[in-house]
Amino acid sequence: MLEILQLFLLIHLITIEQLVTGRNWKGTAFGGWKSRTEVPRLVQSVMRGEMDLKPFITHKIEGLENVNKSIEALHGGTCLRAVIQIAKNEMPKADLPVLKSNVKLEGGWMKQFQHWSEACQCDMTFSIFVPERKNRSDPDPPVLYYLSGLTCTDENARTKAHFAQEAGSVGLAVVFPDTSPRGVTIEGQDDSYDFGSGAGFYLNATSSKWSKHYKMYDYVTKELPELVSKLFPVDGKRVSIMGHSMGGHGALISHLKNPGKYVSVSAFSPICNPTKCAWGEKAFTGYLGSVEAGKEYDATELIRNFPKVHQAPILIDQGTADGFLANQLLPKNLTSAAAAAGYMPINLRMQPGYDHSYYFISTFMKDHIQHHATALGVRAKL
C-alpha cells in the first residue's frame, strides 16, 4: 500500500473522526479507493503506530478554506491519493497507543499495545489477534474478549490457550486485556496473589484506597471495546466474551450486567458465586467495603433477575479434578439459580479428570471458539 501513497495532507495527526470520507470525495480525493473502508483501515494502521507517514508527506495545507488547494494538487498529476485532516484540534501524543509487539500467527497478526486508560488512570496493556482478511471485500470480523484469571497478564492466554488456529480459521478477532492496573503505587497491592496486582476482579472499586485505579469493569466493558473499535478493522457491534477462573467470573458478570451487549458467553472454571467463597469475600471487602456490596458483581445473584429476552448462550467447562471446585468456584450454585430464574441456554460440562490449568483450557478451547463462532454467525473459510 505504501508505494501508491504520494500525498498526505495533514495538520497534526490523523484520527478516524477527522477523516473526510463523505460521498463528495468519492472519485476525487480518494480516486478509486473505497473511501468508507480502505481509507479508515489505513488511518487505523497509522493510529496503531504501524505506519509512519512522514516519508510520504509532500504538502501540508491547513484549514478547511484551503481544501481546494488539495483538489488542485490531486488533479495536477503530482499525486495519487490524499488523506485530509480539517479539524484544528490535535490528538495528544499520550493518547496514541504504543505498539509493543507484532507477530504473524495463523495467517493473522498477534499484536500487543500499551495505552493510557482514563478508567484506570494508568498505562494499560492489551493484546489482540487480528485474523487474516482473505479478500478486501470480506466483512470486518466480530470480536471475542478473553478475560484471564488471578496472577495473569494479557500474555498468558495468548501464549497457552491454543486459540489461534480455530479463531483464524473462522475469522474471529480475540482481545486479551490485563487483569489489573499496573505501574501504580498502592500500599499492599503486591502482598498476595488474590488481591491487588493481577487480581482486579473486573469490578469498579469504591473503597477510597483502590477507587482511583481499580476500575476494571469500566475498562473491559466500555473503554477497551471503544478503543479496539477505533483502532482495528473489526465489527464492534458483534461481540462475545469468555474467561478463565476470575476471568470467567468477569465474563459472566459483564454479560449479566449488560443485557444484549454480548452475543455469547463462555468460561473455564469460573468463580460463579464469589460472595460465597474466600476469593470473592476478600476482593469485595477490600475493593467495595463489604461482601454484601459484592452481590452487584456476583453471577449467581445477577442471574436471578436477568431479563429473558436477552438470554445469550453460556458454555461452562469445569474440570472435576480442579482443587478449587468445591470451595471457590461453585458452578452448581449458578446453574441452580439459573434454573430457578428460567435462564435456559446455560450448558455446564463437567470434564472428568481435568484440573484448573491451561492444559485443561487448551484441550477444550476449540469447542469454545466454535460456540462463539456459531452465535456470531461466522465459520471456517474454504
Residue ranges and their predicted role:
Residues 15-22, 45-50, 102-106:
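Short, conserved catalytic or adaptor-binding loops enriched in Gly and charged residues
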Residues 25, 33, 314-318:
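C-terminal transmembrane module of eukaryotic multi-pass membrane proteins
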Residues 92-382:
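Non-catalytic cap/lid and distal C-terminal segments of serine-dependent acyl enzymes
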Residues 1-28, 66-68:
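Glycine-rich cofactor phosphate-binding loops and adjacent beta1-alpha1 units
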Residues 3-7, 29-32, 57, 178-179, ...:
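Short strand-turn motif at the edge of the Rossmann-like AdoMet-binding core
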Residues 34-90:
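C-terminal hydrophobic helical "lid"/dimerization subdomain
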